[in-house]
């Protein structure tokens, strides 16, 4: 069987300050900078920027 990759789970936290977050897998070898996505925040009811934070 193949080994599992070195993917990390990271938390994408809303920049709106609502506390809403998404969890995403990320390969540390391919990406050096932090992830940021524009996704829907249902608490704010609009699309906002989500930035990467460590998942505990």
Curated annotation (Swiss-Prot):
GO terms for molecular function: structural constituent of ribosome. Keywords: Ribonucleoprotein, Ribosomal protein. GO terms for cellular component: cytoplasm; large ribosomal subunit. SUPFAM superfamilies: Zn-binding ribosomal proteins (SSF57829). GO terms for biological process: translation. It comes from the Bacteria. It holds the Pfam family Ribosomal_L33. Belongs to the bacterial ribosomal protein bL33 family. This is Large ribosomal subunit protein bL33. The gene is rpmG.
